[in-house]
Each structure stands twice: as structure tokens, then as C-alpha cells.
Amino acid sequence: MKLKDTLNLGKTAFPMRAGLPTKEPVWQKEWEDAKLYQRRQELNEGKPHFVLHDGPPYANGNIHVGHAMNHISKDIIIRSKSMSGFNAPYIPGWDTHGLPIEQVLAKQGVKRKEMDLVEYLKLCREYALSQVYKQRDDFKRLGMSGDWENLYVTLTPDYEAAQIRVFGEMANKGYIYRGAKPVYWSWSSESALAEAEIEYHDLVSTSLYYANKVKDGKGILDTDTYIVVWTTTPFTITASRGLTVGADIDYVLVQPASETRKFVVAAELLTSLSEKFGWADVQVLATYRGQELNHIVTEHPWDTAVDELVILGDHVTTDSGTGIVHTAPGFGEDDYNVGIANGLEVAVTVDERGIMMANAGPEFEGQFYDKVVPTVIEKLGNLLLAQEEISHSYPFDWRTKKPIIWRAVPQWFASVSKFRQEILDAIDKVKFHTEWGKVRLYNMIRDRGDWVISRQRAWGVPLPIFYAEDGTAIMTAETIEHVAQLFEVHGSSIWWERDAKDLLPEGFTHPGSPNGEFKKETDIMDVWFDSGSSWNGVLVNRPNLTYPADLYLEGSDQYRGWFNSSLITSVANHGVAPYKQILSQGFTLDGKGEKMSKSLGNTIAPSDVEKQFGAEILRLWVTSVDSSNDVRISMDILSQVSETYRKIRNTLRFLIANTSDFNPAQDVVAYDELRSVDKYMTIRFNQLVKTIRDAYADFEFLTIYKALVNFINVDLSAFYLDFAKDVVYIEGAKSLERRQMQTVFYDILVKITKLLTPILPHTAEEIWSYLEFEAEDFVQLSELPEAQTFANQEEVLDTWAAFMDFRGQAQKALEEARNAKVIGKSLEAHLTVYPNEVVKTLLEAVNSNVAQLLIVSDLTIAEGPAPEAALSFEDVAFTVERAAGQVCDRCRRIDPTTAERSYQAVICDHCASIVEENFAEAVAEGFEEK
């Protein structure tokens, strides 16, 4: 036997290298085969519900890192709630209708307009489901736990029927109407868009300054006067029917020396406009308030059949332009509102593809709206005073990335204005985890217009509306419920398969159809109505869920998307928000803080991370950032997170190895019988347990990460485990001192594994497989530990906080001695302490082997004053010299008692007593050489 064999060197097969990329799929299959999600749900049956409702990602392509962050966050919450006494089911969902899928099929060569619509919709459905299953596999690869066999998908018959019923309730309450108001119109998609489908980019546009000649000045202006107008959308002049001024803005009538014409502009802008137009020696002839100009009539710049009326509008400012804007009610919301109020014609001169129509005039017909500037300039002639290129923020179609226009077309609307206050009141009852989130959603609802819910596309849920022979729209409670029942059985494709009369209740009649003939609506619903109905399609319809949900968790862009549409439909139906809490997340940026883009090549695919590091590292990264704001991610950042993971893993591996001979049923030492340092570590660990439990409850992942890493690095690695080897390796295997420390080790190991499970389930299960004495076969079936408190806890903490200060001072003394070449390693030191009464009392209270805690070979607590050479602090001084004696071959301490023993071992008296007591046979025979 060799002397080293008398040491209790930790033994474990738990590997240092995690091998996550290859092992994770194996564990995931094991969990699936063991039906862990279902078993967890069975364990939680009857417990209070916590329902996190999954906002459905769009089913197109593999998931990106933003999806990963969001869904890992959801998984951490679901797992932590499931292990904290809650019934927390997770039903993943997908949004499956809409233009992107139509675009994919078009790229694949599918020609929608050349094939049967039902066949086309079948292709859309097949593609959408293929993407659902692809993304489902992506999410499962992240280690997510959920009901993967009972997903919710917005194209299923039960979901579509639930959506129709949401619409029906809104129609019954009078919230659905048809109008020809201007809406966001995407010529690239040939469809209306909702606000949530708009994103803003900088766009360079041509702005024109031109003049309208006064036709009837109402006794205020002469007919040789011109009113100067500004526009950034020249094509809309073709539909201009008025000029709008601000009622309280001052306007001046001026005569430039270089002009025979007189002009009206905003007084505040005269100087800048004179410079822009090249006017010199400008004479101000009169000043008017805007309201004085009301109802003056001007000529259209070129259309002699059209007069343009001067009207008042609150939206006019003097921030730019001339203080006067032309008004085309068919091409703008403000224009429409003031135009309708003043009886102006709502003219639309652009078709659904962005092409100018015949009513724009023969010179314009057939041109693309954005290419007509030269023609407009030609038509204006000498009425054009200036033109310039401006860069401004402009709305774009979020899918096609093309600019959009406002365009008045007949559409179906949800009248938000009718129940706006009810929505705002509902917001006040929701808990927001960021105050700005509440303000943002509140302001969006307060300021938004009515919701355009119709779309001129094919792939979606049809609007359940019929038309009588006289054109009357029919959407009664009876007809809508009948459609819902048909969809529930056959799916929404039946709308296209059957004639209108076969979709109506049997025997249905209507006074507007004396011949019994009906037509059906061909528009579909906005996809935000699809996902915005999920509270009914999922929360209300699934037996193990609750409505409202406890939590909605999505990206901050969903304040204008899913949070918004879900809120509107839920309040419209039931008067309550569909969620009790909202937690939002920022965007994922690259390592430099730049937006990720395939064109920039700075995207990170979750699959690439899984191959290089493992999903576990991505999960740990999620907790390492404050995801309520935008966060950065790169392979370098993930490499740093991987180092943190390695530190966590190796620390826990040390605990596994050094409790391999510990049976908690037999070897646990009661708290009251622990050494003071072990009590301290137990208390510190339970403080960590409380911090993590509280942070899980508040969804504060970064708090968990920081607390965990700090405990492992500072409390364990830099202190407790730093001197632990001197106990667990050196002392007798069954000695009280070793069992005391192993008790703490095992307690930390078991509980920290449970605490880690929501974040690192793969690693936690791997550790758990080495804990043979724990009852549950999977750690995921256990409960998170409760934080304990202990008698005299604060006193113990105060004592050890003071000792840590003392330890820091001692380490400075050792460092000085090391720099002076007095010692090399700290075990070569004999440390002499010159304490005052406070420190002396402290060291007595610590009641431990202080030399062992400081990792020095010898320590003397001296009486009397410290020598001048001592390193002095306020309460204590130190001197350091080389320890006397010889190095013990077993404990490596320098000890005066170290000597050659009769059994061929050079060891100190302490080690000799351990060896002689525990290894009598080896002592009798003598140890082998090293």
C-alpha cells in the first residue's frame, strides 16, 4: 500500500468534460420515453394553477436566437413553477396563416390565381404544418419541457371555430363595421395592413412646394392670390380636394418684389420660405388667423373640374413646410377626418398594386405611384415654387420590406373607439414587470385608431359575413354560430368549398334577399385576430388551463402585436385582459450591439450553438443577461458563459467526488453539532436558496445567475473548498470533522442541483444520476428546496463576516511575505497574530483551526505588542516567517513533528495518529515507496 492510498481522495465517474452536444439529445429522448412532462403534471394535479400562455411564433423556417431566448425563458419559468407547488402546464402554440406562407409557395412556383383555391389552401396548410413540426423539434432540442403532442395551432378546426366565436361576440355588441376609411395599404402584398404589421425605416422622398390660385376669396383674399402648399407625397395631388390650415396659426399675405403674384404662407415660416423660393424684398400686405381663411375656395393646380376648399385642422403645424397642407381624404387618416367633416370627396387614384388609375388623369394612368413626380412637376408648371429631397421616417410592410401608402378602400373594422376606456381600465389591473411597458401599451391603446381586420388574401380564416341581394351585410348571432359549428367539424376550408346558401342555417331568410340568394365575404381576417383569439382557442377551451392567464411573456415588439390584439379581443368579449401579468424582453443583438441580419452575416443560429457548446450554454446565457432590455450574443460571449458553466460543473463534481462515501441516512451530522464554519456555510447557502427562490418567483434570472456564480466563486471556491481538502482528504474517513463537512457538501449538492434544474436540466439530471440515495428517479420530479433559518443565525453571520475581514488582512500579510521571498506557498508560513481584544474574542468565537482556515502550516496568537516589522491594521498585526520543521508527505504541512516513521512514512504526528488508527495492516507491513 502506498501512503497516498491513506488519503480520502474524491472518487467519481462524473466527467469533467460535459460533452453536451452529443449527450443532450440522449437525455432528451430518455425524458420523452419516461414521459417526464406528463408525470410532473400528475404530481401537480390539484395544486394552484400557474398558466404561462405561449405567444405563437410564426411557422416559417427554423427558430432564431430571439426565439431561443424567449422560449428558454418560458421553460425556466414553467419548470421553476412546477417545482414550487404549482400546476404549471405548458401548451406550445404556432401562428400559421398569413402572407409569408403564400410568398414561400409563390417562390416554389405555385401560381395561386391559376389553381383551385381549395387545393391552394391545402398546399398552404401542408407547408405550415411542416414548419410547425420543424420548429417543434428546434424547441425540444433546447431542452424544453411541454405538451409537445397537444400543441395549439391556429389552423386547426377547433381553434378556427373559437376565433369565429370571438368575432361573433364583437359583432353582436356592434363593434364590427364596414367603412371606406384610409388604411395602411401594402401594394407589394396587395392588402391592407394593421399597425402591428408596420415597421419604420428612413426613406428619401421628393417634397414639393406649389401654389393653388384663389377662386373665391370670400372677401378676404383677392383672386390674384395664391396659397402656398407643401407635400411629401406628390402622387396624392391627383386626389387633393382641399387645403388645410391651422385655426390658431398666423398667416401672412405677401408680395415678393420678383413676383407679380401674391402668396399666403405661415408667418412663422416666411423667412425660411423666402430664402427657399428666392424671394427678395418681400412686402407683408396683411396678416390673418387661420380661422379667417376657412372655406375660401381655390383651384386645383391642373384639374379644372375640381375646386379645393380651405378647411381647418388640428394636425397642421409650423414645424416644417408652409403651414398649409393639401388634403386628399382618400390617402391619409388626418385628411380623411377633416375631409369628411367638411364634406370633401374621398377620391382614390391608386389601385391595389400601386398603379395610378384612370381617375388620376390620362397623363398619370398606368404609372407606378412613386414614379409620377416628373409628370406632377410638368403639370404644376409655374405653380411649382421649389422641390427638394428629404429623408424621413416612413412606414414599410414588415414582411415585404417595401414602403406602404395610406389608401381608402372598403374594409371591415373593429371599433376600438367604442370600448377604448374599458380597455384602458383593464390595463390598470395588469401587473407589468417594467413600468414603461404599461405606459407603452396604455398609450398605444389610447392613441390607436379602429382596427382594420379584413385582408385581401387567401390563406387565413374567412370573415363569417354574408350579403343579401340588396347588399346588406349579414352577421347575426345565429349565422356566425352556425359558421363556427361548421368550422369546428370541417375546418375553415368549407367556406370556399360551399356556396353561401349552404353555409347559412337551414331555412335562413332575410328581407334583403327576396329570391333567397346570398353572397359570402371573400376577405380573410388579419392574422393578429388569429393569434389575438388564442385566449379563447386555448385558455378557455383546454380543460387544464385558466383564463385569464397568469403570464404573457414575449418580445417588446408585441406591445403593438399580440399583447395588443389579445387585449382588444378579450376586453371586447369579457371585459378583462387575457393576462394578469406581462413580462417583455428586448431584442438579441450581435456582440457589437448591432441588429442581427442575414445580409450582415452576424446572425447566430441556435443549432450552431448546440453543435459547438450545447443548448445548456444557451440556457445559461439567457440567465446571464437582463433580457428586459436588448441583449448581446456572440460566439465569444457564449465562450465566456461556457467557462462559467465549466466552473459550476467542476465545483459540483468536487462535491460529488467528496461525498461518494457519504450515506445521508447514516452519516449526516445535526446542525447543532456542526463546526462554526460549517454552520456559517449552511446559513450562507440557505441565504442563496432564498435569493434564488425569490428570483424565480419574480422571473429575475440575472439575479439567480449572479447569486449562484458569486456563491460558487466566493463562498465555495475561494473559501470553503479552498481549505476543504485539508479536512476531507486528510482526516479519517469516518471522522466527525470530515462527516461535518460532508454533511454541508451533500446538502449543498442536492439542493443546488434542484435549484439549477429549471436552468440547466441536462446537467442537473446528470448530477442526479450520481445521487443514489435520493428518492426521485429524475430531479425534475422533485421540489425546489425551501430556505431554512437557524438559531443564532445573525450572530453566526456577524462572526464570520468579521472573520472574513480578518482573513483578508492575513492574506495581505502572507502576500507581502511571498513578495519578500520569505515564503513561497502559504503552507510554508508560520503566521503570528497580534490581536486586540476584539479580534481575540472573534478567534475564540470562530472556534476552529484558524491555521487550517488560512491554509498556513502554523499559527501563533501572541500576547503583547507587535514588533515594528509587523504588518499592522486597526485591530490586528501580523508577522510571517517560514514554518519550522519538515514537510509532511501526507498533508503537505510543514510541521516540527514530521519524522521518519517505522513504517516507511515521513509524516507529522497528526497524520501518524490517523494512519495508525485506520491502516493498522499497512503500518505493520510498511508502506511502499512513493
Swiss-Prot record:
Enumerate the residues binding L-isoleucyl-5'-AMP: 554
The EC class name is ligase
Give its localization. Answer: Cytoplasm
The Enzyme Commission number assigned here is 6.1.1.5
Task: Return the InterPro entries for the record.
Answer: aa-tRNA-synth_I_CS (IPR001412), aa-tRNA-synth_Ia (IPR002300), Anticodon_Ile_BEm (IPR033708), Ile-tRNA-ligase (IPR002301), Ile-tRNA-ligase_type1 (IPR023585), Ile-tRNA_ligase (IPR050081), M/V/L/I-tRNA-synth_anticd-bd (IPR013155), Rossmann-like_a/b/a_fold (IPR014729)
Residues binding Zn(2+) are: 888, 891, 908, 911
Cofactor binding annotation: Binds 1 zinc ion per subunit.
Protein keywords: Aminoacyl-tRNA synthetase, ATP-binding, Cytoplasm, Ligase, Metal-binding, Nucleotide-binding, Protein biosynthesis, Zinc
Q: How does it assemble?
A: Monomer.
State the domain notes. IleRS has two distinct active sites: one for aminoacylation and one for editing. The misactivated valine is translocated from the active site to the editing site, which sterically excludes the correctly activated isoleucine. The single editing site contains two valyl binding pockets, one specific for each substrate (Val-AMP or Val-tRNA(Ile)).
**Full protein name:** Isoleucine--tRNA ligase
